[in-house]
Amino acid sequence: MHSSRRKYNDMWTARLLIRSDQKEEKYPSFKKNAGKAINAHLIPKLSPKMNIMRSSCGRQEISQFQTKIRLFFLPHSCGVNDVTDLGGKDDELVGKRKKWKTEVRIETSMAECNGGKDFTEMTRIYLSIRKNFFQICLKTHSPQLPLGR
């Protein structure tokens, strides 16, 4: 295990692996490091090319640890540095972008994490393509510590 995992909240998985079928764009298999599966049918389709900015699957909510998680997908080169609620601007961001770095915003509501404290801070997930699977790294977002590149 990586020593950097200590940075992450114990209630969250530092790393999730999403398996993606290269031939058939089926729902990927979401697995936590602990081995608990996340309901894959609640997750939008993820194609190997990361073409997931569509009105039908741009926003999804999944429940994990009894927490509502909302996913916001935006391309790496859209010019938006901060992950905010894009409203109806999803289609505008798609454009003709070829390289995608999916940035995901997690909203937690009434979540009890970190020894019972309310986990109200934003958590960012970064998906990066690693051959046949996507790697998700969770990091707590601090206002004075902007994440991403």
From Swiss-Prot:
Organism whose genome encodes this protein: Schizosaccharomyces pombe (strain 972 / ATCC 24843)
GO terms under cellular component: cytosol; mitochondrion; nucleus
Protein name: Uncharacterized protein C191.10
Recorded superkingdom: Eukaryota
